[in-house]
Amino acid sequence: MSSQFLLAFFLVLLVLGYEVQGAQGLQQDDPGSPALFGKVQESISSYWDTAKAAAQELYQKTYLTSVDEKLRDMYSKSSAAMSTYAGIFTDQLFTLLKGE
């Protein structure tokens, strides 16, 4: 799982690095101009979409049904245990505050 995260992280860094190299050759606008803000916003949005698409593609390539079922089962068991322990903790806290 960590290798997938690292791959996606380096992909995002690579895309951002190419943008920085390409942005150096562009004409410099006034820093306060709305056109520059729009360009930056559009650029960030396009990078986010690219990274999201790459992550989704990577997930679809490495999707394993058995692992997904195990993760869902582990999540349901752990959330049930946490709700039980949260109930016990709440009970103890109310008892402590009430002073019985």
Curated annotation (Swiss-Prot):
Belongs to the apolipoprotein C2 family. Keywords: Chylomicron, HDL, LDL, Lipid degradation, Lipid metabolism, Lipid transport, Secreted, Signal, Transport, VLDL. One of its GO terms (cellular component) is low-density lipoprotein particle. GO terms for biological process: cholesterol efflux; chylomicron remnant clearance; chylomicron remodeling; high-density lipoprotein particle clearance; lipid catabolic process; negative regulation of cholesterol transport; negative regulation of lipid metabolic process; negative regulation of receptor-mediated endocytosis. Component of chylomicrons, very low-density lipoproteins (VLDL), low-density lipoproteins (LDL), and high-density lipoproteins (HDL) in plasma. Plays an important role in lipoprotein metabolism as an activator of lipoprotein lipase. This is Apolipoprotein C-II. Residues 66-74 are annotated as: Lipid binding. It comes from the Eukaryota. Its main location: secreted. GO terms for molecular function: lipase inhibitor activity; lipid binding; lipoprotein lipase activator activity; phospholipase activator activity; phospholipase binding. It is found in: Secreted. Residues 78-100 are annotated as: Lipoprotein lipase cofactor. The gene is APOC2. InterPro entries: Apo-CII, ApoC-II_dom_sf. Proapolipoprotein C-II is synthesized as a sialic acid containing glycoprotein which is subsequently desialylated prior to its proteolytic processing. Residues 1-22 form the signal peptide.
